[in-house]
A protein has these predicted regions:
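N-terminal targeting/anchor module and adjacent flexible "hinge" preceding the catalytic domain
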Residues: 1-67, 74, 92-98, 230
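Cytochrome P450 proximal C-terminal region
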Residues: 1-14, 19-22, 48-52, 139-142, ...
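Cytochrome P450 I-helix active-site segment
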Residues: 24-30, 132-136, 186-190, 239-244, ...
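Conserved cytochrome P450 K-helix E-x-x-R motif and the immediately C-terminal K′/meander segment
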Residues: 35-55, 226, 230, 309-350
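Cytochrome P450 catalytic domain signature, combining two hallmark sequence patches
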Residues: 77-96, 375
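Conserved cytochrome P450 K-helix/beta-meander segment immediately N-terminal to the heme-binding cysteine loop
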Residues: 85, 362-390
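Cytochrome P450 catalytic-core helices
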Residues: 276-295, 299-301, 412-429
Length: 460
């Protein structure tokens, strides 16, 4: 039986007066135990199977929650952009607030707008263009570390990408060397683990209980707050960086005490500013090893454009194939795999009624695999992003950086960093998987590689 016919048999949508469908189709309430188990063990599998079985609009009832999963470019445009005022941050927000506080990722309304205005100037193209030497320098240090491991035991590439991304973040935005804070990467892993535990347990387990995960979380939060305190305490006056802007910004509509505000805003920036780039680069090197023809073409472009010099900002438009590779990596493994919202008032999406208070989800992971917009969607094919082939594709079929007012503020910086790193590493080195070691995606706050990514280093 086809997915289309299953939709018709299993869950025909109800209609209300006037013909609008009341609720999308979806699994029956009796499927709640199975869905909950999938939510805990295989979140990506849950979303993929739901859209395959029921189509572009699915209602998932999991315990007391009903999640409205929409999987069409028009749906994404409506929820995230055109009618974004009717939707606030959604599923997992309360849990994320308990873990990382009220920073830019979790705030709403006037508080969020004030926070965005504070940091946005740091991400303008003209400022980013002047950071090219800093980013190339961090990439060169990565190449040097990897070069020292040629022919040696495997290196945890995911860990190296985290170290690199934190190094770039520290020098470009914070005016600090974050390499001296060795615990940051592990602390964020513990924070993510706790955030997902909070979400799937519906925050029903008190944080004060001395469970191993709670103890790791409290230690991680303490370590990150210490990092934030040291960044503020050792910060020089008059710098051109985020710390300076945060220190100078008035509290305004933000009700948090000053010290808590600085801590939470810096921890949020540390998390958001490194996690997505580190994840994208990890998946990029994984896919390049699986597709040597792509790796060799990328290397040839790097050699032709750069020779043996470091890249500069003006090279970005010349490293076009490298950018296409990164775009395809983010199609298959979008760093943010789910964008969640809560409807603030009754709405209609794709002909379906969405009641006020409903949990709504747009998943870039499933949207980027929609067969109507992506031929052979599981295949790694950077040529999809050749301008000639991309022409006519709906804009909202591809949203690796989100969409609408909450579009990722650091997208240009992240793309420059990823482009420089792929070009500089691939020009000189080849990274290979450890035989027999599976590479499995893990849907946490970002889409990371479960258990790290051990790879051996070889000369190109």
């Amino acid at each position: 039986m086809s997915a289309t016919s299953r939709r018709a048999v299993l869950a025909p949508p109800r209609t209300r007066k006037g013909g609008a469908q009341v609720a999308p189709p979806g699994p029956p309430v009796t499927a709640t135990p199975r869905l909950f188990l999938q939510l805990v063990r295989d979140r990506l599998g849950l979303l993929t199977s739901a859209t395959a079985a029921y189509g572009d609009a699915v209602r998932l009832t999991i315990g007391p929650k009903s999640i409205y999963l929409f999987n069409h470019p028009d749906h994404a445009k409506h929820v995230l952009a055109d009618n974004s005022a009717a939707y606030h941050k959604g599923i997992g927000l309360a849990e994320a607030k308990r873990v990382i506080g009220d920073g830019l990722l979790t705030s709403e309304g006037e508080v969020w707008r004030a926070q965005r205005r504070t940091v946005q100037p740091m991400f303008q193209n003209k400022r980013i263009a002047h950071q090219d030497a800093v980013i190339a320098g961090e990439a060169a240090r990565l190449v040097e570390r990897l070069r020292a491991r040629v022919g040696g035991p495997p290196v945890d590439l995911a860990g190296e990408m985290t170290r690199l991304a934190l190094g770039v973040l520290g020098r470009t935005l914070l005016g600090a060397d974050l390499d001296r804070f060795h615990s940051i990467g592990h602390a964020f892993e513990d924070m993510q683990d706790q955030a997902m535990f909070e979400m799937v347990s519906l925050s029903m387990v008190p944080l004060w209980l001395p469970l191993p995960g709670h103890l790791r979380f409290r230690r991680a939060r303490r370590d990150l707050y210490r990092v934030a305190d040291r960044l503020v305490a050792g910060h020089p006056d008059g710098g051109d960086d985020v710390v300076t802007r945060l220190l100078a910004s008035p509290a305004g509509v933000d009700p948090r005490p000053a010290r808590r505000r600085m801590r939470e805003d810096l921890v949020t920036l540390l998390l958001a500013g490194h996690e997505t780039t580190a994840s994208t680069l990890s998946w990029a090197f994984h896919l390049l090893d699986r597709h040597p023809e792509v790796r060799e073409r990328l290397r040839a472009e790097a050699v032709e454009v750069l020779g043996d010099r470091p890249p500069v900002y003006d090279d970005l438009h010349r490293l076009r194939y490298t950018a296409m590779v990164i775009e395809e990596v983010m199609r298959l493994y979008p760093p943010v795999w789910a964008l969640t919202r809560v409807a603030q008032r009754d709405d209609e999406v794709g002909g379906y009624h969405v009641p006020a208070g409903a949990d709504v989800m747009i998943s870039p992971y499933t949207l980027h695999r929609h067969p109507a917009y992506w031929t052979d969607p599981e295949r790694f094919d950077p040529e999809r992003f050749d301008p000639d082939r991309a022409h006519g594709r709906p804009r909202y079929a591809y949203i690796p950086f989100g969409a609408g007012p909450r579009f990722c503020v650091g997208n240009h910086l992240g793309m420059m960093e990823a482009t420089f790193v792929l070009a500089m590493v691939s020009r000189e080195l080849r990274l290979a998987h450890v035989p027999g070691r599976p590479v499995v995606p893990e849907a946490m706050l970002s889409l990371r590689v479960r258990g790290g990514l051990p790879m051996t280093v070889h000369r190109a």
